[in-house]
Swiss-Prot record:
InterPro entries: Clp1/Grc3, CLP1_P, P-loop_NTPase. This is Polynucleotide 5'-hydroxyl-kinase GRC3. Belongs to the Clp1 family. NOL9/GRC3 subfamily. The lineage of its organism: Eukaryota, Fungi, Dikarya, Ascomycota, Saccharomycotina. It comes from Eremothecium gossypii (strain ATCC 10895 / CBS 109.51 / FGSC 9923 / NRRL Y-1056). GO terms for biological process: cleavage in ITS2 between 5.8S rRNA and LSU-rRNA of tricistronic rRNA transcript (SSU-rRNA, 5.8S rRNA, LSU-rRNA); rRNA processing; termination of RNA polymerase I transcription.
């Protein structure tokens, strides 16, 4: 980290876009209250496009009086370099708020902080924060320690004594992972985390127009009420959130997860470490915008209070993955039957293990057509104790959506679900305020998640260059190594043997492991998984990228993420390779660096620098075919 403190000037930009992006702000006073009554029969069909709301409702921009409280770094006064720990020390008064973009680790050495309405005391624990510029960034508010006595942990001896006395809150900020290097492979996402290179985080100034995540009282009240149920529940608690696109569904679940795991942490005075870790089960059924799943996949994972990653980590946060199923597409509509089967398999496995902890269910923001089928099926399987509807203007979601009056489980017996109607977020274009940044739409964010998955070397390290610049792994197929292939486009193995190699090279595939040799039918030299075989019951390993295939010698060159390479080597055989519809980002095949003039004379896979002549291979054949209108004359 450089000794010279530089805070870059940021371009004006928005947040949240795409098929189900999170909220950036919640309008104050836009909801009249929380109701806990059974859902009545719907009278109107819910429209995903939000109805107009009060245009004078203030969005959460940090300006005016709020901007005056934003922390501004002054080196030598409230900002110090901690070279020994490769970090910086920030000193804040109790009324100041800190806005940071990027990936970083935070330790509260003195006082406390408030983040998303949750208070954190000083201690030895370090928290991981992920704040991409595509999302609204929650402010970190300085506060006092919630204790009768003042404590401090790890304060550097070189820090002036008057500084320690003057400031109520002192933080140590250190660098996080180098995931920003992955984003720079795409021209659109080069500044997804910070606006400059050289550091994984950046302190935002008031003039940078930082968009804080501001919640109204109704959202806070809902979190507080559900927190009481979480603490007092004698059995398991099951929370299900239903909402359309851009309704704030994913953000609400993320806030509830933080509330459940960090909202009631007691710490010891000696170390500042919590007494015990709480656990929450997260059933992630949204393949298009997953919170913890691999790209184009659904999963069940466990989150603990000790390792929870804060902010929007874009599926890179800490978790214990229990079950993952590759769907092969970012939308369940591509293979609907397979999606419903996979969802049922995951929820059934979670149910059979008798989990007594709180569980959160994340569904796609699809509330029309087949989306209602997904919601009804998920409700039947999950049997929620608490259901949250994010609606616009109090409109009910659908006539076809009917919530049962009673559910029954082995742990709780029969029970009536509690239903909450909450005002969803609606985006407004207000004159004079920055518009949505088009670079951060849903397709680009999905591409980033895939790049991050393929380039991940370890928990905190990512391969910064294109995969083509590194050697692939050679894996045999047939009698060892990869022992079966499956194409989701044609499960009956109707591909010709000469086309299989071409259909796999340069494509993203999923690698599964079977405990027993799979049932196959040979198609030339390729063993094809039988149509009756169910690969979703096998163990998910990783997504991978096939570089090339040597049919004669029966091996393929394949790129496997570094963080799972050890597991792949230990398993060795009985792998099943599944080809879906996952698209590889163009920057992986055609990196801008390899297209520069210095690489023009090199042989690069998939890239040709030869330029054809004008009109070469251009055929304009006139077809004397009568159009439909000709028959009417």
């Amino acid at each position: 980290m450089s000794d010279d403190f530089v805070v870059p000037t940021y371009e004006v930009g928005g947040s949240d876009s795409g098929s189900d992006q999170d909220i950036s702000d919640i309008e104050e006073g836009s909801f009249n209250g929380i109701s806990a009554t059974p859902l009545p029969t719907a009278d109107v069909e819910y429209v995903s496009e939000a109805s107009p709301m009060d245009a004078t409702a203030s969005l959460g921009y940090l300006s005016g009086a709020e901007g005056a409280n934003l922390y501004v770094a002054r080196e030598g006064a409230n900002y110090f370099n901690d070279a020994a720990n490769k970090a910086v020390v920030l000193c804040l008064h109790s009324y100041e708020q800190l806005a940071i973009s990027g990936v970083f680790k935070l330790q509260v050495m003195k006082g406390g902080i408030t983040y998303n309405s949750i208070h954190y005391n000083c201690g030895l624990h370090t928290y991981d924060f992920w704040h991409p510029l595509s999302e609204s960034i929650p402010p970190i508010a300085a506060s006092f320690a919630a204790d009768w006595e003042e404590h401090s942990y790890g304060l550097s001896p070189w820090l002036p004594a008057d500084i320690k006395e003057e400031y109520e809150c002192i933080l140590r900020i250190s660098e996080g992972s180098n995931i920003g290097d992955v984003g720079r492979l795409m021209a659109e996402l080069g500044q997804l985390w910070t606006r400059h290179t050289g550091c994984t985080f950046s302190i935002l100034r008031p003039e940078d127009y930082a968009r804080p995540l501001i919640l109204n009282k109704d959202w806070d009240n809902l979190q507080a009420e559900l927190m009481i149920h979480h603490m007092n529940s004698e059995h398991d608690m099951r929370v299900m959130c239903i909402g359309g696109k851009n309704s704030g569904k994913s953000t609400l679940l993320r806030l509830l997860l933080q509330k459940f795991l960090h909202g009631n942490k007691s710490t010891t005075k000696a170390t500042g470490v919590s007494h015990e870790a709480d656990v929450v089960n997260y059933l992630d059924m949204d393949p298009g915008q997953p919170e913890y799943s691999a790209p184009d996949s659904i999963s069940w994972s466990k989150l603990t209070s000790e390792t929870l990653s804060l902010g929007q980590h874009l599926a890179q946060g800490h978790r214990e993955m229990i079950q993952t199923t590759y769907i092969g597409s970012s939308t369940p509509q591509t293979w609907p039957e397979m999606y419903l089967t996979a969802m049922e398999h995951i929820i059934h496995k979670w149910e059979m293990e008798g989990q007594m902890n709180t569980a959160l269910l994340n569904l796609p923001g699809w509330i029309k057509g087949f989306g209602i089928t997904i919601i009804n099926k998920a409700m039947e399987l999950f049997k929620p104790t608490h259901i949250i509807f994010l609606t616009h203007g109090g409109k009910l979601i659908s006539k076809e959506l009917v919530v049962p009056n009673m559910f029954e489980t082995m742990q709780k017996g029969k029970y009536k679900p509690m239903i909450y109607n909450l005002q969803a977020f609606t985006q407004h274009n207000i004159p004079g305020l920055p518009a949505q940044d088009p670079r951060y739409h849903a397709a680009n964010i999905r591409s980033f998640r895939l790049l991050a998955h393929l380039h991940r070397l370890s928990e905190q390290s990512y391969y910064p260059g294109p995969l083509l610049s590194s050697p692939p792994l050679q894996v045999s197929f047939g009698s060892q190594g990869i022992m079966a292939f499956r194409f989701l486009q044609d499960p009956s193995s109707g591909y010709h043997q000469d086309d299989i190699s071409a259909a796999l090279q340069g494509c993203v595939v999923c690698l599964y492991h079977s405990k027993m040799p799979p049932d196959i039918d040979m198609c030339g030299v390729f063993p094809m998984l039988k149509h009756s075989a169910d690969y979703t019951s096998m163990d998910f390993v990783t997504l991978a990228l096939i570089h090339s295939i040597d049919v004669e010698r029966k091996f393929m060159n394949i790129y496997i993420p570094g963080h799972v390479s050890g597991r792949v080597h230990s398993l060795k055989n009985n792998f099943v390779l599944v080809r879906g519809a996952t698209d590889l980002p163009l920057c992986e095949l055609y990196p801008q660096k390899l297209l520069s003039s210095s690489y023009r004379n090199r042989e690069i896979p998939y890239v040709s620098f030869s330029k054809r002549k004008k009109y070469e291979y251009v055929w304009k054949i006139r077809k004397n075919v009568r159009r439909r209108g000709h028959y009417n004359k």
